Amino acid sequence: MDKIEHIGIAVKDLETSNLLFQRLLGTAHYKIEEVASEGVRTSFFKVGNQKIELLEALVAESPIAKFIAQRGEGIHHIAFSVKDIIAEVKRLSSEGFVVLNEKPMRGADNKWVVFLHPKGVNGVLVELCQDIPQAEVE
């Protein structure tokens, strides 16, 4: 794994949370994006070389809506940047980690993403991210 790519925070209201984090960080978000396949709308803030992703549920069945219903707003996941997501999934599977989606799916911010089950990582949902090559970006 190369670096911490971002920290994902589940929020009830993206607009209100964007204003809160703008006041906290002293800078505005640089991107808002919907990930229809996951039923979420996201915004991103830069903090030094790192990012914070705020995630708002768009539908009641989305993973973010379920997370907020069970735990309330707060840190949802930590994401790590990887160079080869397929190789990293194989490595982590061989180490006994439970991969929630072995086939990478398209996530926010032009990334391929895979998630590890939190039960095997001290209760932390881990996301692996690999940049989608520009030629594949729609």
Residue positions per predicted region:
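Short, structured motif recognition centered on aromatic/hydrophobic residues
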Residues: 4, 18-21, 45, 52-55, ...
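Short loop/beta submotifs within extracellular cysteine-rich repeat domains
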Residues: 16-17, 27-28, 52-53, 60-63, ...
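Residues at alpha-helix termini
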Residues: 23-24, 70, 94
